Design a protein with these regions (language model features):
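A short, N-terminal "cap"/entry segment at the start of jelly-roll beta-barrel domains
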Residues: 1-46
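Conserved short histidine dyad/triad with adjacent acidic residue
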Residues: 37-39, 50-66, 100
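Short histidine-centered beta-strand/loop micro-motifs
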Residues: 44, 60-65, 106-108
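Ligand-binding loop in jelly-roll beta-barrel domains
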Residues: 68, 100-122
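Short acidic-glycine-tyrosine-enriched beta hairpin
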Residues: 85-100
Length: 122
């Protein structure tokens, strides 16, 4: 396979992304998910790599991962997460990861909360 063919297979254009809008895990509001890499593209190492945009007052509902874990990287905005039973503020540059624990994330700021999320298989 040529180098050119390899490079083409590594790029996914914005108009090729799957975009899903709606509530997540029983949370509040309409959340936008851009599925950056999904399914077979992840070679069964992870379930999804996505960019989420959570409007002011919206949230991803309380949920737990038992056969995988979830990592968030906050790009912009402010939020609240459940961390070992305690509600903690997060913002741009923070990393949140949840393994075998219940968690949620809520936009607590005055602008969209935008973050990258990956669900990794154990």
């Amino acid at each position: 396979m040529s180098m050119k063919a390899l490079l083409i297979n590594m790029i996914k254009r914005k108009d090729e992304l799957t975009k899903v809008v709606g509530p997540i895990e029983g949370g509040k509001g309409e959340i936008s998910r851009e599925l950056l890499i999904e399914g077979d593209e992840l070679k069964n190492k992870a379930k999804v790599f996505a960019k989420l945009t959570v409007p002011v007052g919206a949230s991803v509902g309380l949920h737990e991962h038992t056969d995988d874990y979830e990592v968030y990287y906050i790009l912009s905005g402010k939020g609240k997460v459940l961390d070992n039973g305690e509600v903690v503020e997060v913002g741009a540059g923070d990393v949140v990861y949840a393994i075998d624990t219940e968690h949620y994330i809520e936009n607590s700021g005055d602008e969209d909360l935008v973050f990258l999320a990956v669900i990794v298989n154990l």
